Amino acid sequence: MPIIAPISRDERRLMQKAIHKTHDKNYARRLTAMLMLHRGDRVSDVARTLCCARSSVGRWINWFTQSGVEGLKSLPAGRARRWPFEHICTLLRELVKHSPGDFGYQRSRWSTELLAIKINEITGCQLNAGTVRRWLPSAGIVWRRAAPTLRIRDPHKDEKMAAIHKALDECSAEHPVFYEDEVDIHLNPKIGADWQLRGQQKRVVTPGQNEKYYLAGALHSGTGKVSCVGGNSKSSALFISLLKRLKATYRRAKTITLIVDNYIIHKSRETQSWLKENPKFRVIYQPVYSPWVNHVERLWQALHDTITRNHQCSSMWQLLKKVRHFMETVSPFPGGKHGLAKV
C-alpha cells in the first residue's frame, strides 16, 4: 500500500515532464522517488534504485506531504543575500545617471569603491566594493566608453524631425528616400580591438605617410540598397556626382528625397545651383549634432569595422579595392552579411 497520498494523473504527467526537462538531477531524483512510491514500491527499493539513504527518502516524503511538488525543488546554492538587493540595484541605476562631482567628490567617473561608499551612506549598510562589482551586471550596468556630445539643441529640431518622418512614411518606388553622408578613407589603418593571446599584443604595420580618399554614399531607406561614388576631395563636386548617380539609377522616380547633415558641401552655391536645375531632388537637413538620425552612419561604421580597422594594405589602391568590393556586396544593408563575405 502506498505510504504517500494518491497523486492525480495530471500531476503525475507534470512531474514526468519536469523530470525530462530539469537540469537539477537532485530534483529529478526526488520526483522519481515520489512516482515510485505512488506505484507501490517500498522505501528500501526506492533508496536502492536511486542510490540514496532511506532517511533521505523519508525526508523527501515529509517535504512532499507538507508542500507538494514545490517542496521537492532545490534551494539556491549558498546563503541568502544579507542586504536588500533590489533596492540597492535601483540606487545604483540612479547613481550612475549622475557624476560623482554632483555629490561633492573630485572624481569625474564612478569607481566601485566610491559607489559602495555612497550606497553605504544612503542605506546604512556595510557593502564591500567587491560586492558592488558583482551586482553591477545584475543591475544592468556595464563599463562602456562614453560618447562626446554638445549641449546645443537645434531650435528647429521638431520641425526637421517631422519632415524626416513624413518623408519616410511616404517612401515608395516613385518617391524614394535616401540617407546620405560622406566618409574619409585613410591609408593609415584605424586601430581596433581583435582577438589575441594574453600578453602578446598584435602589431599593425602602418605605411607612415597617410593618404586620403573620400566616398559619398546613399542608403535607400526602404530597400537598403547602397549607391556610392568616390573622389580625392570632399567637395560639392563629390556630392553632385552622387546626385547624378541617383538620377541615372532612379530615372522613373518622380521625386528623390535625401536626408543629409549640415556639412558645407550640402549647402554650397554650386550644390544649390544644381538642385535648382533639377527640381526632382529634395534635400532635408537633419537636426544639428544629431548624427544618429542618419542611418548611413551605421554603414560607415560597418565599413570601418570590416575593412579599415587593422588593415594590412601598404598602398591606397589595395585598400580601395577592398572598399569597393565591400560597397558592392553590402546591399541590402543591414542584412547583407557583409562580415562573412569572401573576396
Swiss-Prot record:
Transmembrane segments: none annotated. Pfam families: DDE_3, HTH_23. InterPro entries: Homeodomain-like_sf, RNaseH-like_sf, RNaseH_sf, Tc1-like_DDE_dom, Transpos_IS630-like. Gene3D superfamilies: Ribonuclease H-like superfamily/Ribonuclease H. SUPFAM superfamilies: Homeodomain-like, Ribonuclease H-like. GO terms for molecular function: nucleic acid binding. Keywords: Transposable element. NCBIfam families: transpos_IS630. This is Insertion element IS630 uncharacterized 39 kDa protein.
